Amino acid sequence: MTLAFGEWIIHRRWYAGRTRELASVEPAAVTALGGGLDHVLLDVAYTDGSTERYQVLVQWESEPVDGYGEAALIGTASGPDGTRVAYDALFNPEAAGRLLSLINRSETIGELTFSREPDVTLPVDAPAKVSGAEQSNTSVIFGKDAMLKVFRRVTPGVNPDIELNRVLARAGNPHVATLLGAFETSSCALGMVTAFAANSAEGWDMATASVHDLFANEVGGDFADESRRLGAAVASVHATLADTLGTSVTQFPIDTVLERLRSATRAAPELAPYAPQIEQRFRRLADQPIRVHRIHGDLHLGQVLRTPESWLLIDFEGEPGQPLEERRRPDSPLRDVAGVLRSFEYAAYQQVVTGGGDPQMADRARSWVDRNVDAFCAGYAAVAGEDPRASGDVLAAYELDKAVYEAAYEARFRPSWLPIPMRSIQRLVS
C-alpha cells in the first residue's frame, strides 16, 4: 500500500498528534474485507520517540467519486491495475453497511473478529450516514435504529466503552444505549454498535438554551427538573456498576491531584496565587478512605442525551489522553458528580464571558447554577440514598481537581474562557 497517509491524517479532527512533530505514518496491518474495502491499522511515529496506532477503513475506487466529499479523499495509488482513488470508507454508505453486516453475521476475517450481541438483529439494510458530532472517533448512523462507532486511535487492552456498556446493558440499566455488537483484534477493540437514541437532545445544548432564555427574560427556561432526572440517572448507573463489578476502599489520590496542580500551574500562571490553598485542601484528604468502583470517568453535559423516555449516559471511554489502565481504574463516583457540577458552571458562565462579564448576568448565572446543582444532587440522593454534598470536602476536592485541569486547558487553547474555572477556584478555596 503506497498511500500518503501522513498528509491526510494530520487534517483529521480525530488526529491527536497536533502538538508533536510527525516522523512517519506506516501501515502496520491491512485486511481485505471484499468489494474494494480494506481495513488498515496505521503506526504513527513522532520525532520525540512516541508512537500511536490509528484505524482507517479504505474504500478503493477506479475513478473519483463526487458523493464522498472532500474530507473523505485520502489520495491515489498506482498499481498493476492502474491508478486507483482511496477514500475513507465510512463516508460510503455501502461500505459502512458491509461493516455492519460483518458484525451482524459475527464473522472472522484474518485478525479481525466481528461479533453481534445475543438476541439482537442489526439494521443492515437501513440507510447509513456519518455523524458530524464527534471529535475523537467516527460514528455512522443506520436509519433510526443503530449507531456504529469506529475508534480512530486504538490501544491494546479492554476498551472501557464496550466493557461498561455491555455490563450496563446486560444488567438491564435503562440509562445507556443498548450494546448491539463490536469488532476487534486479539489485542484491541476497534468499534462498537449501540442502539441509536433517535429524537434525543444533548444535555449541554439543553442547559445552554435554558441559560440563554434566562438571560433573555426574567422567567427564563427552567432546567432544574431535568437536572433532577439526570442526577437520578447518574446514580442509577453508579449503582449498577457497583453492584455488578464490585466496590473497594482506597486512599484519596493525593499524588495524582498534586501532580496535576503542578503541571497546570506551569501552563496557567494565574493559578499560582491559589496553588498553596488548593494544595492544602488536597493534603487534608491525604489519609481519607474513599469508596471506589468503576465510573463513567469523563462525565459532563456533553456526555448525556435526553430521549423522550429518559436520560442516557454515553461515551464511557474515560478521560481523554489518559492511559488505558488509568481509564479502567476504579474511582470515586464523586468524580462523575463533580464533572456534572463543573459542567453546570460552564453552561451558565460561558455566556457571561462572551457577554462581556456583566455583573447582573453573573448573579443570575450563579442562581441558575445553584438551582441546578441542588436539583441534580437531590435526584442523585433519591436513588443513592445520600446527597453527594454530604461528602463535603471530598466532593469539593474533585471539583477543584477538575477546575485546575480546565484552567490549564483554557490557558493553552481558549484564554478568553479562563475566567470560568478561575471563578470556580476562587469560590472553592474561599
From Swiss-Prot:
Keyword ATP-binding: yes
Catalytic activity reported: D-maltose + ATP = alpha-maltose 1-phosphate + ADP + H(+)
Stored InterPro entries: Kinase-like_dom_sf, Mak_N_cap
Pathway(s) the chain acts in: Glycan biosynthesis; glycogen biosynthesis
One Gene Ontology term of the molecular function aspect: ATP binding
Protein keywords: ATP-binding, Carbohydrate metabolism, Glycogen biosynthesis, Glycogen metabolism, Kinase, Nucleotide-binding, Transferase
Enzyme class: transferase
EC number: 2.7.1.175
Source superkingdom: Bacteria
Keyword check for Magnesium: no
Protein's GO biological process: carbohydrate phosphorylation; glycogen biosynthetic process; trehalose biosynthetic process
Role of this protein: Catalyzes the ATP-dependent phosphorylation of maltose to maltose 1-phosphate. Is involved in a branched alpha-glucan biosynthetic pathway from trehalose, together with TreS, GlgE and GlgB.
Record family assignment: Belongs to the aminoglycoside phosphotransferase family.
Subunit structure, as described in the record: Monomer.
Name listed for the protein in its UniProt record: Maltokinase
Taxonomic source organism: Mycolicibacterium gilvum (strain DSM 45189 / LMG 24558 / Spyr1)
Gene for this chain: mak
